[in-house]
């Protein structure tokens, strides 16, 4: 008789413990139900990137001295630099510069170590294409500045979304500074 009673007591304790665990997880689920949605409706709303965001690389042809430091510090030897030595002035003349963004890992080493600051990272992150050969940007394509997300009036940015309007009570423009 005694083993049967202890068995029922263990069963009761296990049932209470299981109910407590289920109740705790249910309370966590309910606490998350009150939060505002985090999802961004991508084609219509774009996330404003931070100033340290590592997007597409911008290249200024006139500043480049063809030193090839960017190629040496790149972990995958990605930038292709074609140059010719001008014998009359005894300097390198840059002929072609290209980066294949299908291979680039966006580490930023080329930008960091460039002695003339001819490379910089932009906020552009929309590089998708149907043909991988279109991701090979030459000096002309690298020299184009991207359209700023804040300055693009066709896109409703996250700063003007309903989430911010609810939190602050008024819509924000692109010049408003917020502390998150």
Curated annotation (Swiss-Prot):
InterPro entries referenced in this protein's UniProt entry, alphabetically: 4Fe4S_Fe-S-bd, 4Fe4S_Fe_S_CS, NADH_quinone_OxRdtase_chainI, NDHI
Q: How does it sit in the membrane?
A: Peripheral membrane protein
Q: Which UniProt keywords apply?
A: 4Fe-4S, Chloroplast, Iron, Iron-sulfur, Membrane, Metal-binding, NAD, NADP, Plastid, Plastoquinone, Quinone, Repeat, Thylakoid, Translocase
The cofactor(s) it depends on are: [4Fe-4S] cluster
Q: Where located? A: Plastid, Chloroplast thylakoid membrane
Residues involved in [4Fe-4S] cluster 1 binding: 64, 67, 70, 114
Residues of the 4Fe-4S ferredoxin-type domain: 55-84, 95-124
Q: How is the cofactor bound?
A: Binds 2 [4Fe-4S] clusters per subunit.
Q: Which reaction does it catalyse?
A: a plastoquinone + NADH + (n+1) H(+)(in) = a plastoquinol + NAD(+) + n H(+)(out); a plastoquinone + NADPH + (n+1) H(+)(in) = a plastoquinol + NADP(+) + n H(+)(out)
UniProt: [4Fe-4S] cluster 2 binding residues: 74, 104, 107, 110
Top enzyme class: translocase
Q: Which GO terms describe its cellular component?
A: chloroplast thylakoid membrane
Q: GO terms for biological process?
A: photosynthesis, light reaction
The record's annotation in Gene3D superfamilies points to:
3.30.70.3270
Q: Which GO terms describe its molecular function?
A: 4 iron, 4 sulfur cluster binding; iron ion binding; NADH dehydrogenase (ubiquinone) activity; quinone binding
Task: Please state the Enzyme Commission number of this protein.
Answer: 7.1.1.-
Please name the NCBIfam families in this protein's record.
ndhI, NuoI, PRK05888.1-3
Per UniProt, subunit arrangement is: NDH is composed of at least 16 different subunits, 5 of which are encoded in the nucleus.
Role played: NDH shuttles electrons from NAD(P)H:plastoquinone, via FMN and iron-sulfur (Fe-S) centers, to quinones in the photosynthetic chain and possibly in a chloroplast respiratory chain. The immediate electron acceptor for the enzyme in this species is believed to be plastoquinone. Couples the redox reaction to proton translocation, and thus conserves the redox energy in a proton gradient.
Task: State the PANTHER family in the record.
Answer: NAD(P)H-QUINONE OXIDOREDUCTASE SUBUNIT I, CHLOROPLASTIC (PTHR47275:SF1)
Protein family membership: Belongs to the complex I 23 kDa subunit family.
Protein name stated in the entry: NAD(P)H-quinone oxidoreductase subunit I, chloroplastic
């Amino acid at each position: 008789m005694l083993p049967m009673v202890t068995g029922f007591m263990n069963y009761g304790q296990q049932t209470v413990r299981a109910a407590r665990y289920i109740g705790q997880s249910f309370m966590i689920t309910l606490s998350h139900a009150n939060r505002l949605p985090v999802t961004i409706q991508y084609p219509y709303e774009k996330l404003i990137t931070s100033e340290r965001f590592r997007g597409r690389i911008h290249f200024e042809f006139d500043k480049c001295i063809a030193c090839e430091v960017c190629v040496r510090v790149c972990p995958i030897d990605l930038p292709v630099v074609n140059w010719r030595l001008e014998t009359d002035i005894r300097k390198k003349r840059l002929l072609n510069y290209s980066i294949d963004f299908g291979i680039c890992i966006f580490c930023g080493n080329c930008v960091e170590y460039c002695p003339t600051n001819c490379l910089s990272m932009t906020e552009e992150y929309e590089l998708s294409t149907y043909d991988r050969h279109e991701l090979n940007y030459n000096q002309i394509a690298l020299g184009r500045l991207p359209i700023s997300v804040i300055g693009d009036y066709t896109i409703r940015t996250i700063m003007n979304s309903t989430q911010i309007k609810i939190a602050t009570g008024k819509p924000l423009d692109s010049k408003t500074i917020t502390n998150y």
